[in-house]
Amino acid sequence: MNKFDIENLDLYYGENQALKAINLPIPVRQVTALIGPSGCGKSTLLRCLNRMNDLIEGVKITGKLAMDGEDIYGNVDVADLRIKVGMVFQKPNPFPMSIYENVAYGLRAQGIKDKKHIDEVVERSLRGAALWDEVKDRLKSHAFGLSGGQQQRLCIARTIAMEPDVILMDEPTSALDPIATHKIEELMEELKKNYTIVIVTHSMQQARRISDRTAFFLMGELVEHNDTQVIFSEPSDDRTRGYVNGDFG
């Protein structure tokens, strides 16, 4: 069963075509890794999944991108879409407020005022992001006092507090040390039990470790996609083989 079905998707920044006839199914409750050299279109595609590209002037998109069978570029509420499809960015970006308020922020923005309910969601979300035990005694402390890895997990907690269906991750560990990276990767194994995850990564080792499916992009084209084990051991295209073997990047 697929969470997203992408069919003949083209994207232009003005006259420049950044994505060319992309056809890609993204299965539900699995980790799909988007790989390829810089500028290949993988982050552009990621941002199509919650219409973040709408914020860029001069963008034009054609083709179909459906979530649960509904075209997300049709008559949909974009604000609701971005709740259902949360995003974690490359650099941790906690809000300039307490740990607690970071997680509660989205709930308050929706008009939720019940403190008991907010408390429950904050704890559940921090537990879901494997952060509760590290911060439960300092929830009122400023989020900027956390380490980089903790800040990134806080951003994940802030995302899952909104009860999304999908979590998009744009190189979420590129700014983290190996220990913090390992914790995020372990967390992803747990998160995929409840969420569909799509991750952009430059690390072949990371894609191999954490993803169920991998899609390889080159110069705006989707070269191939398959089970991750197949992409790394028996790719069908010589360009994929060259990339995963480190011949270019």
Swiss-Prot record:
Q: Which residues form the ABC transporter domain?
A: 4-244
Its subcellular locations are: Cell inner membrane
Q: Which BP terms does GO give this entry? A: phosphate ion transmembrane transport
The topology of this chain with respect to the membrane is: Peripheral membrane protein
Q: By its UniProt entry, which SMART domains does this protein fall under?
A: AAA
Primary subcellular site in the record, as a coarse category: membrane
Recorded GO CC terms: plasma membrane
Q: Which keywords does the record carry?
A: ATP-binding, Cell inner membrane, Cell membrane, Membrane, Nucleotide-binding, Phosphate transport, Translocase, Transport
Reaction equations catalysed: phosphate(out) + ATP + H2O = ADP + 2 phosphate(in) + H(+)
GO molecular-function term, one example from the UniProt record: ATPase-coupled phosphate ion transmembrane transporter activity
Q: How does it assemble?
A: The complex is composed of two ATP-binding proteins (PstB), two transmembrane proteins (PstC and PstA) and a solute-binding protein (PstS).
Its annotated function is as follows: Part of the ABC transporter complex PstSACB involved in phosphate import. Responsible for energy coupling to the transport system.
Family that this chain belongs to: Belongs to the ABC transporter superfamily. Phosphate importer (TC 3.A.1.7) family.
State the protein's name: Phosphate import ATP-binding protein PstB 2
